[in-house]
Amino acid sequence: LKKTGAEILIDALAQEAVDVLFAFPGGQVIPIFNALYDAKDLKIVLVRHEQAAAHAAEGYARATGKVGVCLATSGPGATNLITGIADAYMDSIPIVAITGQVPTSYIGTDAFQEADLVGISRPVTKHNYLVKDVRDLPRIFKEAFYIAGSGRPGPVLIDLPKDVSVATLENYQYPGSVSIRSYSPTIVGHPKQIEKAAEMIKNAKKPLIFAGGGVISSGASAELFELAVKINAPVTLSLMGLGAFPGEHELFIGMPGMHGSRTANNALQETDCIISVGVRFDDRVTGHVGSFAPKAKIIHLDIDPATISKIVKVAIPVVGDAKNILVALNKILGTREVSEWNEQINKWKGERLFSYKHSEKSIKPQFVIEQAYEMTKNKDAIICTEVGQHQMWTAQYYKFARPRTFISSGGLGTMGFGLPASMGAALAQPGKLVLNIAGDGSIQMNIQELATISINRIPVKIIILNNEYLGMVRQWQDLFWDKRYSSTCLRGGFLCKDCKGPGHCKVKYVPDFVRLAESYSILGLRATKHADVVPVLTQGLESDGPAVMEFAVTPEENVFPMVPAGKPIDQALEEL
């Protein structure tokens, strides 16, 4: 069977069961798009910016666990993918990014739209390839999908020169298996280490489970639930772990860290045994590392040995797949009765994990999230967010019940992530309700994707919490920089030293999100007072197709609790 490099690419996507490709064309990938013209059973989504293609591939992967795929041309097209690739790398998301490249004979000559993508992407990919011979292409594609989706997942980049994409391979056959001598992830945890972990858990007086995105990647939520209930241990989840354990369960104590619950942070500081599963002890969780969990011995279950004892000292490491390890651990452990530790947790917890000052004089952003939760909690909805205050309020007030229902940028914290990610999630899970919760700052980073959403009639429901600020940066300026709001007001511009707040500003706020939505043939709705919130949400959520719902929220509302950077996590600031 004879095929060109471009045709091999199309067949590889079919062999790997890829059903959606997020792409933008250009000169060096014309042969690939020519082959795509005849592709069957593959939906090609033409984005409006390559960064959005990478984030959409992430959204697809985060919603399904399958490998997401994006395609861009050489030079600026490829470099525009890098932010999304870096985002996937930080959050361990499996994507394959395919980039065009100048012909092999031109590489190194500073040719038109040439960029060293292998060099640029090396720090933010799990692996990358520059294909120099069409005979290598079938093997490279097979390896790329395997590497992206196995072990600790992550992005893989394939840089494909134009001459390779038009070259012909005689006797083409797609490989049935992969053999990479230098890559062999440990899947099964060592039995002796699992036994040691079980013994430490049995002897613990104050056990605490701290789980993260690795539980979701592994598909280990059921096993995590079994462990928690069996040993009656409170559960705290990292931002990436939300949904791995039911948010309304009595053992759940919220997210820890900078904007985590006081209950979770207190528990981390008082526990004598942390059972950590698929987490990396990010600085936003630990706060001042030297003061983190001072009384605890830490058991760390993770598929990536490089994460163990990288940030905090671990007493018992267990390397392997979280699901396999938890299955083995659950077989050994017996049940544990409710103890004084559980009673202490419940005292800290009180009636609710997070609270804010309610008001009907303005729209509180937390209230919008709470109402969105009440309206969607029984609909198996997927909630995406951008990055900023709204992201933290969503993590605090939306009680995620299942894995792969919260999709957000964690490690890189990428503004502009949510809108394209929600496109990818909606296309990955047709028929499911998908929301994108955004701030007025973040949404404008990739707002051009409203065109992609409109043209493809992707039924994403977009909630914009418009406080007319870059809210999270403004909050830091408010709390730590004497309210010097430099370049954070989205109404007035760079510096308004006599500023009395958006309500007193003579400058008109732009854009008008309702009219902007309508210009893309998308339903646009706006709430300007407390009483508008439920009607606007109801109309938007019940509408056919995509909808933009803008809420004019309290401008200078802050996210609390807040642990100042570098401080111990039990020294959080609270709302005055």
Task: Name the predicted role of every residue range.
Residues 1-336, 371, 375, 459-462, ...:
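N-terminal alpha/beta PP-like core and its mobile active-site loop of ThDP/TPP-dependent enzymes
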Residues 9-10, 14, 32, 36, ...:
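Active-site diphosphate/adenylate-binding microenvironment
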Residues 29, 50-55, 390-392, 529-533:
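Short acidic loop-to-helix transition motifs that present clustered carboxylates
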Residues 98, 106, 112-113, 309-311, ...:
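Thiamine diphosphate
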Residues 124-127, 179-182, 346-361, 498-500:
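Short glycine/proline- and acidic residue-enriched helix-loop micro-motifs
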Residues 153-156, 335-348, 361, 548:
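Flexible, glycine/charged-enriched surface loops at secondary-structure junctions
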Residues 157, 300, 384, 437-438:
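Generic enzyme active-site microenvironment
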Residues 159, 384-386, 550:
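Short beta-strand segments
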